[in-house]
């Protein structure tokens, strides 16, 4: 909330029927004192539908979509509005992401075909399409490993740490997530 500007809207989407009451309790604390909007939609093992519902719930000209297990660098949040204004003809912006997995071994790296740099960043810059113009023709497709379609122009933010989303997890969570994706 510290980077929220006057016209900004924060929309949090919860997986209908699969979100704990403790999550709702935290969201209620924030929504009582801000412009936080909470929407529910069933994930139903379909990430594209889930993201499209979130997109439909947003009213701004652009959407900066961040997953629940990510957070943006402070510099990125401080400059994102300026980046969009300077490039307002761009439909989508690809944002670099720093992935770090605590407990990752060489065996995991080999098994999943990952690249890990000297800073222990996995597959850096791992660009994600996360800033998008809020127009009907742009939407997500594919149940898993979803892709954005309908955009006419795109731009990539610099692969500098200050422009990154940060995505941290431990190896147990990563293994569980990979197994889940394999079932879809």
What are these regions (language model features)?
Residues 3-5, 58, 85:
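Short, conserved loop/helix-junction motifs that constitute active-site signature segments
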Residues 2-40:
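Acidic donor-binding segment of Leloir-type glycosyltransferases
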Residues 9, 60-62:
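Well-ordered beta-strand positions
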Residues 68:
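Walker B catalytic motif
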Residues 40-47:
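Short, acidic/glycine-rich phosphate-metal binding loop used to engage nucleotide
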Residues 26-30, 57, 83:
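Alpha-helical structural signal in soluble globular domains
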Residues 47-55, 62, 71-184:
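Catalytic-site signature of metal-activated, phosphate-bearing donor transferases
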């Amino acid at each position: 909330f510290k980077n929220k500007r006057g016209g900004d809207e924060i929309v949090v989407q919860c997986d209908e029927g699969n979100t704990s009451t403790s999550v709702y309790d935290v969201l209620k604390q924030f929504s009582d004192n801000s412009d936080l909007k909470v929407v529910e939609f069933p994930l139903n093992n379909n990430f594209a539908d889930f993201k499209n519902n979130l997109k439909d719930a947003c009213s701004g000209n652009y959407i900066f979509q961040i997953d629940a297990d990510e957070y943006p660098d402070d510099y990125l949040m401080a400059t994102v509005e300026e980046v969009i204004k300077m490039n307002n003809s761009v439909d989508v912006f690809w944002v670099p992401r720093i992935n770090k997995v605590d407990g990752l071994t060489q065996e995991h790296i080999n098994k999943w075909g990952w690249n890990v740099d000297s800073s222990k960043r996995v597959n850096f810059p791992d660009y994600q399409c996360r800033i998008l113009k809020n127009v009907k023709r742009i939407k997500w497709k594919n149940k898993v490993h979803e892709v954005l379609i309908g955009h006419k122009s795109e731009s990539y933010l610099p692969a500098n740490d200050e422009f990154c989303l940060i995505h941290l997890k431990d190896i147990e969570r990563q293994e569980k997530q990979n197994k889940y994706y394999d079932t879809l």
